[in-house]
Amino acid sequence: MLKEIKKNNKLAFIFVIINFIIGTLLFYEALFRSINIILITLLLSYLPFIIFFIISLLSCHLKDNLKAIKVIKIVTKILTYLQVFYYFMAIFIIAILMSLNPVTNPKYYKFFVNSDELTKVFPKQIPKNVENVQFYYAPGVLQGSTDYVLYYIDENINLDNFKEKATWIGTKDEYTEVNGLLSGAFSYTPIEYKNEDSFVIYLIEGNCDDSKYCNHGKYLFAAINENTNEIIYKLSFW
């Protein structure tokens, strides 16, 4: 069957394989979202694959109709060019969907927090003896920030590791080194705009562009409230 499809429309067969691979790469992150987002992303990701697969089947079914085969091959070439524009649109729409529908289930933590950069501060896995675990991940689109946040309550916090790695230690309002860098430090965390100065920030990495307003920047830190045993890990870049 596959040999027959390949023989009658080689170009369509090639793009069946290519589009399946691209679709799988686009769809992967949607697996961790709601069922509605999964279904929408599934359609956007695999639509070109479905179209070229149907074309391949038609080429096989109509192999003896030379006129039909000629038309199908012309349509295949046209769609080959059009799919480039389609993927630009689909990637943008999927990126917006992923950004507006963040991952908040802690059981998916290890799928997203696995790079060396993140694990400089974030734990490689969520400790079992902690309470009130909350996780947040959302990729940025255009000027929006990409954010990773982990929050929990831990009665056995060890500060030594953070002190060794920190380039700066203090509360949010005490930070004056880079204008605007930590203005949204606690966004997407459970304590946003609430008792922010009760947390001591251990800033591991922080930098901004030369705009003086931090239009583009990045920070990585752990923030700890020793009175309540709350700890927040966060990476944000925009």
How would you name each of these model-derived features?
Residues 7, 36, 67-71:
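Juxtamembrane loop-transmembrane helix junctions in multi-pass integral membrane proteins
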Residues 86-163, 168:
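N-terminal export/targeting and maturation segments
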Residues 48-84:
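Cytosolic-side transmembrane helix boundary signature
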Residues 28-35, 61-65, 95-103:
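Transmembrane helix-loop junctions in multipass membrane proteins, especially transporters and channels
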Residues 3-15:
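N-terminal membrane topogenic signal
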Residues 166-238:
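Extracytoplasmic electrostatic interaction patches
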Residues 17-60:
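Membrane-embedded alpha-helical segments of integral membrane proteins
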Residues 12-15, 27-35, 46, 75-76, ...:
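Non-catalytic accessory regions used for complex assembly or targeting
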